[in-house]
């Protein structure tokens, strides 16, 4: 099987070479010389090597599925955070006002309720896991801006990891094709020597 180098975590840089490691995704090493590669211990037959490469390919597919799910979740969170920040900025402007704010809020799909919100300098934010906390508007805005920055960085990191993973797919597929072609040539060569004998 192609050699692999394991990374440690998000945003870490490999010692010495200055490259970012990708979520512990093992790097597929391109097989330059198939003959010498097939002579390595554990690479007795092309079938064994192809099976190992296919297992590695399936692992990459599984990793891609997980990263794609994380990406979808982040792409859904970022607009929600931005919308909440816009609402907080509006509340910040209206904080000194004495009149109450008339609004409609979503109860369920296509079902809204009308509400009158008195002037306040406090807001409640859903933190997840059925937890809601009350914050000052400034604290809530700082928290949401930090969360938006983190979510954006994570999304960028996921994009890089998915690109890296696509490169590993390609390398593994090319390695599989090279080993398969090597085996076909070897068998044709064996058949031609048997026919001559």
Curated annotation (Swiss-Prot):
The modification N6-acetyllysine is found at residue 59. It is found in: Cytoplasm; Nucleus. Keywords: Acetylation, Chaperone, Cytoplasm, Nucleus. It comes from the Eukaryota. The modification N-acetylalanine is found at residue 2. It holds the Pfam family Prefoldin. The keyword Cytoplasm applies. GO terms for molecular function: tubulin binding. GO terms for cellular component: cytoplasm; cytosol; nucleus; prefoldin complex. One of its GO terms (biological process) is protein folding. Binds specifically to cytosolic chaperonin (c-CPN) and transfers target proteins to it. Binds to nascent polypeptide chain and promotes folding in an environment in which there are many competing pathways for nonnative proteins. Belongs to the prefoldin subunit alpha family. Heterohexamer of two PFD-alpha type and four PFD-beta type subunits. Binds to the C-terminal part of VHL. This is Prefoldin subunit 3. It comes from Bos taurus (Bovine). The gene is VBP1.
């Amino acid at each position: 099987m192609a050699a692999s180098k394991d990374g440690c975590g998000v945003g870490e840089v490999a010692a010495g070479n200055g490259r970012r490691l990708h979520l512990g995704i093992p790097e597929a090493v391109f097989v330059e010389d198939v003959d010498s590669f097939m002579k390595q211990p554990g690479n007795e037959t092309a079938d064994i090597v192809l099976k190992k490469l296919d297992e590695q390919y399936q692992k990459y597919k599984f990793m891609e599925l997980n990263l794609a799910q994380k990406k979808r979740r982040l792409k859904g969170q970022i607009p929600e955070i931005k919308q909440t920040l816009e609402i907080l900025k509006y509340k910040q402007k209206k904080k000194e006002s004495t009149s109450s704010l008339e609004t409609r809020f979503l109860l369920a799909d296509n079902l809204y309720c009308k509400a009158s919100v008195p002037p306040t300098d406090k807001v409640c934010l859903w933190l997840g896991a059925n937890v809601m906390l009350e914050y000052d508007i400034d604290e809530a805005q700082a928290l949401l801006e930090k969360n938006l920055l983190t979510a954006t960085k994570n999304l960028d990191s996921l994009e890089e990891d998915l690109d890296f993973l696509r490169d590993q797919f390609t390398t593994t597929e090319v390695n599989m094709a090279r080993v398969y072609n090597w085996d076909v040539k070897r068998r044709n060569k064996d058949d031609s020597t048997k026919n001559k004998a």
